[in-house]
């Protein structure tokens, strides 16, 4: 007879929600994770009194009231609004693309002026059916927005020229003709006060948890540990890369503690020119409106993936 009803591989958000719901229904769960901590990619670590998002910025947002009420069982959320900034050759632009962006780029004031400029640029390009991502983006937003805010950033993310990327990667690029810097359109939005790790800790309180545990080694030694397995890792790895590895990318994070109370004045700044090696800088204290004397920043570098490093 198995010791557990469920072996859950991965202590991230999906695995932890499953474990919580299962234990609430009287099931016995063992949750394992190959990392040395729980919470997966939403893991936050307190550094200098600042909750640092160790795997990139995570802003919770939803329009579903039931989901919002559910996560608020495990943590209080603040009213943070995601309003990233793009830096291109020392000029700053608001994201997502909106009237603040267009006003800075072209010195205009009205939606009609912005629409006319974009439409004119698209017409001059005379692109038929887009053959690649570059043509797709140009046909959607015109030359200036593409060259300044999309091209370099996208090439850094994917590690190849936009002309070598398929058009289907970008289905649409939202253009807002209002002065609204809110990145999301959802009804509810915020950051867990005190970090996200506490949410996962509470969800896993009724389960057995083992970190630093590789599933493939563990299951060899414990083949009958559970009646059922919930696997939240890489599906290609689960099947032994039988058909080869999927086309992942990876991200390298370079964290730095700085002796200043405010480095960039915003939580997220994207660097969209190709010459800057990183894709963005996150200043974590701004997620919770921190007043600490020091600050922690993370530079993100996109990288080729290979087995043994984190896939994204």
Where is each model-derived feature located?
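N-terminal Rossmann-like FAD-binding beta1-loop-alpha1 element of flavoenzymes
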Residues: 4-31
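Short His-Asn-centered micro-motif
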Residues: 9-11, 32-34, 62-63, 194, ...
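Conserved beta-strand segments of alpha/beta enzyme cores
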Residues: 28, 51, 76, 208-210
